[in-house]
Amino acid sequence: MANKIPENLATILKEIGETPATSLWDCHGTWVINHKSLEKVAVRFGIKFDDPIIIETDQKNKCVVLTVRGRRNVIAENGKVTEVTDWSFGEATPYNNKNGYPYAMAEKRAKDRVILKLIGMHGDTYSEDEADDFKNSKPKGVR
């Protein structure tokens, strides 16, 4: 069973008009969030993305590896605005992606990871698109 939902994650979900029941589920003790909610989080926090950089592509074999960099402004206690950036890989290959659209899956995985990093939740919460096991465990009530 997963630990209690982190308070900051529950607050973020409330700010985007979602609830844990509509956005999260427990997969073997790890919180998983749906992609739709992460897109809303990116808008709420003003996260912007650079164009992806394709590291490897093999269209015939449906293999794509790319990186995405994201950024957001953070206001410090002293009122100073600082731009915070982070990046991640997104991979889609036949062994980790059953969909017929590897470029879109690689991009979704990379962006979702960057969003989670930029809000301080990566490692505590995962995106539904990071693993088929996560998506397959999604309850019917979660959109």
Where are these regions (language model features)?
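Polyanion-binding surfaces on beta-sheet-dominated domains and ring/shell assemblies
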Residues: 1-143
